[in-house]
Amino acid sequence: MKFFTVLFFLLSIIYLIVAAPGEPGAPIDYDEYGDSSEEVGGTPLHEIPGIRL
């Protein structure tokens, strides 16, 4: 059982290293998928009937 625990730990560390995006210390690109200021989902809440903001 200890073998599987050690194996899982090592595979987890390897996964974290491989899955890490970009270079260490590089700034995060929040606009990678487009302009973050765009509305998500379509209709703004203030245009939906019955919702008062």
UniProtKB/Swiss-Prot annotation:
Lineage top rank: taxon: Eukaryota
Tissue: Expressed at high levels in salivary glands and midguts of adult tsetse flies.
Keyword Secreted: yes
Compartments, as annotated in UniProt: Secreted
Keywords attached to this entry: Protease inhibitor, Secreted, Serine protease inhibitor, Signal
First and last residue of the signal peptide: 1-21
Gene Ontology MF annotations: serine-type endopeptidase inhibitor activity
Recorded GO CC terms: extracellular region
Function: Potent and specific inhibitor of human thrombin. It is also a potent inhibitor of thrombin-induced platelet aggregation. It is capable of antagonizing host hemostasis and facilitating blood feeding.
Protein name: Tsetse thrombin inhibitor
Biological source species: Glossina morsitans morsitans
